[in-house]
């Protein structure tokens, strides 16, 4: 099993079995890595190199060869222990991200060993083809990491050579990890073509993401909504929170940031209208939805659809559009009336406003705070794809999207074209943006829920605990997606995960 990749001293550190014991062996290997806790290995007696070659390749205009950076006892994972103690304080952030990669690889090897042991306990033989597959998977992980390092160091020769091998091994209809790797290969290839020579600053970004600008993206987005539970989960929790906020209110006003992500129908608002029309007591005297968006034709279609549905429910309904970007919004754009109960709904939108400077998002949040909403519903991807270092972002994204591709394995057959469309026209676009873009072009700046808590607090919001964990679990059982999805409560937020790996986090906020 890829023995050439093992360190001479065996597994380093003392994991005490707590991180590995609860892992589900059906999940792909990369999805098992516990990225948030690599520093448990800090007292490791094993030699460390912490990627000295890769760390200094920018200065030396050199990148380590594949066998040097990946092989056993090579400069990537072994040797050079003395360098660790003599590093300056300024190099500590680099060490942390390289430590992440080391920890990821160790987790991969540990899980492979567990898989073989489990097969043996079940009476199965680890045949040659299984060993070959494990070896191929290990090689693919090694190549991806080495290629990411080469791209980060702007070594086009080495990176191009690795990309040729990766394209042959990362198959669109292959295993879960082969498929996710194919998306990262596309991103690395795009980044490589745009990197500037050594000495230049940054990476030139490709065009900004547009909302459903092709028929393929339209179809992929609709398939994601129908098949994957992420968006529907966000809608369910958001609508439940909105209904609670509107209880007893007569004039109700929803401010929707992004309007259903560009979906062709107003799925979320049809459900809310039905619930409001049939709530206890009497329905509101008027429901007003103000949408922020820049795709007028689609919004006109959704407006007509929702108006017809409101008429069928005998619900007084008003639909308005603010044709602006989130960054240019002003409180006056929403024309809030006296006596209106306002809620703000943000489904997978605000991460696009996060920039290198903290001020951009904070300004938007403060202007939204001026609307004095009864509740602000925030639904975002629960992963750290906005770190300052490319390699750290790369590994976080690999971890996150490996879990998503694993879930697609459980939901759809191997050669189902719907799965290929979802992966290649939706999730691959997110991956490529995270991997290949910098500056304003990088809009998929997903962050963990803890970071969103800090951002919301700075803007003057305070958390409102979501007390509906049982309803969320019942909803998950009702939609019957497949086994493996989980709902967890975390500090008042609800998190949808795949085999306990967080995928989507929902939280509610009110004005302080």
Label every PLM stretch briefly.
Residues 1-512:
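Long, compositionally biased intrinsically disordered terminal regions
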